[in-house]
UniProtKB/Swiss-Prot annotation:
Record keywords, A-Z: DNA-binding, Transcription, Transcription regulation
Xref: Gene3D superfamilies: Transcription elongation factor, GreA/GreB, C-terminal domain (3.10.50.30), Transcription elongation factor, GreA/GreB, N-terminal domain (1.10.287.180)
Encoding gene per record: greA
Cited InterPro entries: GreA/GreB_C_sf (IPR036953), TF_GreA/GreB_CS (IPR018151), Tscrpt_elong_fac_GreA (IPR006359), Tscrpt_elong_fac_GreA/B (IPR028624), Tscrpt_elong_fac_GreA/B_C (IPR001437), Tscrpt_elong_fac_GreA/B_fam (IPR023459), Tscrpt_elong_fac_GreA/B_N (IPR022691), Tscrpt_elong_fac_GreA/B_N_sf (IPR036805)
A Pfam family the protein falls into: GreA_GreB_N
Family classification: Belongs to the GreA/GreB family.
GO molecular function: DNA binding; RNA polymerase binding
Function recorded in the entry: Necessary for efficient RNA polymerase transcription elongation past template-encoded arresting sites. The arresting sites in DNA have the property of trapping a certain fraction of elongating RNA polymerases that pass through, resulting in locked ternary complexes. Cleavage of the nascent transcript by cleavage factors such as GreA or GreB allows the resumption of elongation from the new 3'terminus. GreA releases sequences of 2 to 3 nucleotides.
Domain of life of the native organism: Bacteria
Organism for this UniProt entry: Acinetobacter baumannii (strain SDF)
PROSITE patterns: GREAB_1 (PS00829), GREAB_2 (PS00830)
Name this polypeptide is given: Transcription elongation factor GreA
GO biological process, one term: DNA-templated transcription elongation
Amino acid sequence: MQRYPMTPEGKIALEKELQHLKTVERPRITQAIAEAREHGDLKENAEYHAAREQQGFCEGRIQDIEGKLGTAQVIAVKDLEQNGRVVFGVTVTIENLDTEERNTYKIVGDDEADFKINKISVNSPIALGLLGKKEGDEVKITTPQGEVEYEVVSVEYL
């Protein structure tokens, strides 16, 4: 069985979403289906079909979250050996050796990734290229823009 890495914060966020889906969305959709049924003929009842579609999406997401939580490998950065290497959960600053542009990223699980707030998936090309590296290491990473050479500036276990 494949383990699904996530931070403690990521686990809490998924648990909150699951709770919301089960206690708010599921009952709301069930009520919408019941109201749509009262309108009669279900063959041409757009409200009914829309509510059933919402129900399918909601139940699918519930199953998805339950599966991920069931196989979660929660990794707390503070509990890791702080050996200066890039691993899941660390915050890493890298510098593009061509442009001298610096970026700082936190390496997180797939569901936690949000590039707008500099959280990248452990399965992203950048994270995969950085895993195992330490401060001062140079690495070539294939990105959508082509191959880019970076230097690991800092690794923080925050």
